[in-house]
Each structure stands twice: as C-alpha cells, then as structure tokens.
Amino acid sequence: MNIEEVALKYALANAVKYGGKADVKAVMAKIMAEVPELRPRAREVKEVVEAVVARVNAMSLEEQRRLLEEKWPEALEEKRPEQKRPGIEALPDLPKVKGGVVVRFAPNPDFVLHLGSARPAILNYAYRLKYGGRFILRFEDTDPRTKRPLVTEEVNAYEAIREDLRWLGVSWDEEYIQSRRMEVYYDYAKRLLAMGAAYVDLCRPEEWRRLRNEGRACPHRSQSPEENLELWDKMLEGRFREGEAVVRIKTDLSHPDPSVRDWVAFRIIDTSKTPHPLVGDKYIVWPTYNFAVSIDDHLMGVTHVLRAQEHSVNTVKQSYVFKHFGWEQPVTIHFGRLKIEGATLSKSKLKALKVRYDDPTLPTLAGLRARGILPEAIWELILTVGIKPSDSTVALSNLFALNRKKIEPVANRYMYVADPVRLVFEADRELVAKVPYHPSFRERGERVYRLGPGRVEVFVQRQDVKEGAVVRLMELANVEIERVEGGVAYGRLHSLSLEEARKIGAPIIQWVVDPVEVRVVRPWAPGRKVEEVGLGEAVLRGVEVGAYAQFFRYGFVKKIGPDVFIYVHD
C-alpha cells in the first residue's frame, strides 16, 4: 500500500471541504478509521501525512479540487445520509440545472443567525437536497470597521453560526472564510487593473459623488494600467490613508442607478484602529462585498444564487466583474422580504437590547432553540413561504402553531397552579382522581390521587374561586365555593360526575395536592422575561431536563433545570 497516495487522497478531500486548508489531525483520523491496518505504523504514517498536508496546503483550492476530481472523484460524492424533508419536492424547479447545483449560504459573522437569516440557509440547502451537488458555507467578513465580525469572550459568531446550522439540520460540503482569502482577491484585482477594467481613484469622496451623479468620468478613470498598478502597490504599502484611494470597477457611467456607476471594489481600512478578529492588522486594503462575492462565486463553481430581493442591485454590480473576466454568472433567484409579526429581526435593534444572543425572548436561532422551538417547525415555515418574489408577512404565532403540532404528541400533561390558594372542603367518601399522562397515549400510564374521606385540602388558582360558584376539580369532584378568606377558600362537596358539572356549567379547573414549587420563565418581549412561581404536581420532579410538557389550561413548557420550566407557547 502506498501510504503517500492514501494521505494525498484524504488530505485533498479535507482541504477541499474546508476552504483549501487540510488538517493533519483530521487526515490522520480519517486514515486510521478507513485503513485500520496502518495503525501499527502510526508514527511513520504521521510523518508522511505532515509532508503531504504541507504540499496540499501550498496548492490553490482550484488545483486541489482538480487533482481530487482526476484521481479520486468518488471522494467528492456526498456520502452522508440525506434527510427527507417534507415540502422540498414541492419547491419550484430552478432553471438551468445540469445534474446538480452548487449553492451557498454566506452570512456576515457580525451577529448570530435569526429567523430571517434561516430562510436563505434552508432554501439553499433544500435545493441542494433536491438536486444533489454542493452546499457551501462562506463567511463574508471583509469589513472589520462597519460590520466588524462578532468575536468576544461571550460569543464567537463564526462558531455560533456553525452551531445554529447544525441544529437546523443544515450541513455543508465546503467552508470558506473570506478574510483568509485576501491574497486571492488581490490577485484578481491586479488582473483587472492590468486589463484596464478597473482603476485607482484618488478623488475626494464629495468630488466623486458629483461626477457620478452627472454621469461623468473622474480624471483617474483614464489612467494607464501601469499607473494603476503602481498606485495599487502604494495602497498595499500603506502610502494612503482611509478615504484617500479606492479601486473602482469600470461599469456604465450612464447606468440609471447611480450606485452601479464605477462601484468601489477595494477600500482602505486602518486595521491598526479596528483590527480584524481573525487576521488582525495584517491587511489594510479590503475588498467590498460585491467584489469578493463575484470572485468567490466563480472560483467556487456556484451555479445558483438564492437571496433576498434587496440584493438585486448587487447582482447587477457583480455582473460587470463576470463580464470583464468572460465568466458565466450564476443563475440568481431573488425572493421577497420576510417580515415576522411579533419579532424584531433588525441586527442593530437586537444588539441594542444588550442581552445574551441565546436569550429565549429573542428571535435568534439560539434564542428560539432555548425557548423550545424545534428546527422542524422553522423548516416547515420557511418552505411554506418558499421563494416567491413578493414580500411575505408571517406572524410569530404561525411558527408557534407549527411547533405545537410537533411537540403535542411528546408532551405529557400535568397540573400546575399559578397564584395558588388553598381550597378546603369535607368529603363524606374517598375521592379518586385518575389523571392520564396523555389522553391520546393511554399506554403511558396515569397518576392516581386518593383524597378523603374527611377534610380535603388542595391548591387551586386564585382566579378560579369565587363565592357561590361551583367548580369541577379535574378528574375528581365538583365543589361549591362557600367563602374565601385571605389565602384560603372554603367549600362543600357538591357532586361527583362530570355530567353534572357540564349540566350546571361548572368550569373545569386544575388543582394540586402535596405539590412542589415550580418556577416558570415566561418570555414577554425582546429582552424582557418574567419569572412566575407556582405549584405543580410532585411527579414534575421526575421530568427530565430538556423534555416538553403541557400544563393544563396554561400552555406548553420545556424543563430547563430542577423544578424550572420555560414557557414555549400556548
């Protein structure tokens, strides 16, 4: 067996999957798992792997993929079992699909994902599942000044986004981080400058805006490629300060949208003042969104781009880069804006709340996860809205309704009393209550409560007891409230049957005996929640953390700690 060939295969596969950089440990683990007979030679194998990984990492991503396709095309095939998702086949067909699609989800890691950003992630991945191909995760983080990536002691947005996608059930075939591809962008910038398709502009911003609005060229547009390349080198050397020089793509100065006219491809950002969390102050000349996206979509072989309608002008801007290089632009599908009634999706507003990103009051994916929303409910919501070009408005209650359908079968029923008062009455016989854990799944069993004969004491909710009224204690008996004194209600046994309660219109209320104190966290508004203390059945102590339950006449909850539940929805 040729160890070097085995190492090359897995190093190339690892590098292609993770943006061009193979990892020695990952390659070693793969080799030992796939070729166990090499385990006794681990030290020898590691030396070979280290040398091969170094050689592979020196290649461009395009070279890595080409070599892998030539020698081991099967290594590029998708091997993970693919989940069948209801609704995927109902999505409208994409145009110009040839065998499979290459799609991408490209978040800016200046914040974590929320319900709105789940839409492009799910839709792109859904088409990847529908047609086969590749799904790319690309972090677009080339603005360390105004859209600085969020990396703090509390949260690393890069990892948080990965975690959110895994929770959603979205897995990626390749991953890229744009801030680690700066040399690639520099290379293509030089090519455009040498072609005369771009130029270095030294105009003052206000002068440029005046010329642009008049549809006139700035003086630097006619510079020779040699002059532009010299100015480009000076930009890289730090000879210009912020705002003194930019690189512009030559477009159409008469374009009806002034923002399309010779848009900025590179600008200077003083990273000594605003260092990038991943690459520090290594670079001061940074590509703009539209330039980096154009280069990456081509080099990564993206075939279809699904994104929000607000990006339509960006598609126009990017078309000029594709035209200058003679590349085919990906098929682009723009879908309408998704508005969620009852949820704030603005990053700036969410940041201003100054609460943890996984706070259950927030519509972030981490917040929804903490609250008890299932990823399957989010999938169903997004696939129902689909990729229609018109704007859509969906109430947060729609998501709750979908989630309710999914947790209802697994959520056992329990009695819980908020704002409790003691109810005392005399029983002339033994009263027996059999409370099933789930009315639709009787095989799960029931709790049996035996009270009386004699004095009976239970706890009920304060608002349920009114003098002179008859109430039905669920599964137990009908009691007439005679008087209420302070925190105690006194009553008498009225009757036993449910039929009698219905006949006289007695409300059915919850009650607990020998209870445990239960705390319920209720999300109230973004950044605001209240904690309610009540009494619950003692069997709630046995509910596992993470399990769902339904409190009768209250709503669905999820256990998050000893005797602590979070309110999910009604």
Swiss-Prot record:
Domain of life according to the entry: Archaea
Reactions performed catalytically: tRNA(Glu) + L-glutamate + ATP = L-glutamyl-tRNA(Glu) + AMP + diphosphate
First-listed, main subcellular location of the protein, grouped into a coarse class: cytoplasm
UniProt keyword terms in alphabetical order: Aminoacyl-tRNA synthetase, ATP-binding, Cytoplasm, Ligase, Nucleotide-binding, Protein biosynthesis
Cellular component, GO, one term: cytosol
Similarity comment text for this entry: Belongs to the class-I aminoacyl-tRNA synthetase family. Glutamate--tRNA ligase type 2 subfamily.
Protein name stated in the entry: Glutamate--tRNA ligase
Organism from which the protein derives: Pyrobaculum calidifontis (strain DSM 21063 / JCM 11548 / VA1)
